Amino acid sequence: MDIVKNEICKLLTKRTVLILLFLLVLNPVLGLYTMNTVNDDGYTGKDYSALYGEISNYSREDVLPEIEQRQMTAEAYGRISLCSRVYKEALACLSYDEYLDSVNEKADEISIMNKFSGNGGFAEKNAAKTSRVYSKLEGTVPEVMDASGLLNITDNELTDYVAVIMLFIIALNLVFYEKSENQLALLRTTARGRRQLMASKSFVMIMAVILITLLLYGINAVISMCFYNPINLKSPLQSVYLYYGSPFKLSIGQFLACYFPVKIISFILLGMFFMLICAALDNIIFVFVASAVTVVIEAICYTTISGTSFLAFLKYINIMYGVRTGRLFSDYVNINMFGYPLNTGVLYGLFWLVCIAVCIFAVTNYLNSVHEKRLLLLPGFACGKNTGCHTSLFLHECYKALVPGKVLLILIVAAIFVVWWNPAEKLSYDSVDEVYYKEYMDKYYGPLTAKTNELLDLSLIHISEPTRHSLISY
């Protein structure tokens, strides 16, 4: 226990605490900014929540006509887009029984097609299994409700990536800095080497994961309570449009009770993986590069690979699939495992059990024995690759340029900010006509040539006289 206390004290250095506090404050600031920023459809997250608050007093029979009436009387493009989105979500909730019927009908169609073709393969098994799973949801009645507060907690991509950065910083302080200062050399002479120390570091990482999760997502929960409509924890999970296709018969409260343990487990796996990288590599530049490349590759596999691709296992056997935990509950996907439909949630669970066991074992046992290179003594002379102290001048210069002045950390933060901040021009429109005008002008943008004149004349033939006059004057 004393070793654990010492590790916690060594982790809470001034530099580490300041960086973690900065990230902790940055998360809600960017979240509030995003909530009040007009998106590409012309409305803010606050407008979306406000519209749900306005229609919450209407009955199930009156809510769709009310939204349709608001859409017809709206003049601004953003208001029209907002009403269209809310109408689509409300219609989906009110027609949930039809959605369940369509799942069963699709299963029957696939079964009939496979019987005629004589192929009782994966498609038929998958359809039958999907139908059985969704049949348990019969009788579920989703409510038309504002899900912004819940999604701000469970599907906030910015918070997920801030948590990943915080885990990396903690792993770096737990493992790499002591190792780089050669403070662990004497432990190799003890009976248990560094195994007990690394086990304590692993325990501290688990504690840090739980604390980070409670702080980051707890702050998001406070923001949701202050700025969004209240969340009805007794409503079915399918009331949230993003979880409309969920196969789980859970209330929102039960969903949250399952969500956070899965999130914590996924973060533990990622933290252990960062610790393993720090234990295996001796150069801080290699640690940064290896960690960044790993996260980028995982994110690319998760976001770009289709669920129907033969590489789908790379999408679902993926740390980012667990970090973005909501997908484990919102989708029901089976992949072809030797002709048998295996659910991706089960697959990820098996993947987690194997990987976290391997990472904990590797972290606690790596470098338990001496790994220094030895000289090979031959008659008359000694030959060895590491006969003396050797430093790569290139890596030394990289270290001087990036690490002492925190330049590398600043560059990483700047890169994340650039990715988050879309530099593209954000346009807002007051009417649908302005959208048409903008598309028209973009289409014929450029010097006025004979070919452009010909295209303009052809397009004006199909336009009425008032509209033609408006375009010419515009």
Regions inferred by a protein language model and the residue ranges of each:
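Terminal transmembrane helical anchor/hairpin motif
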Residues: 38-43, 147, 230-254, 285-380, ...
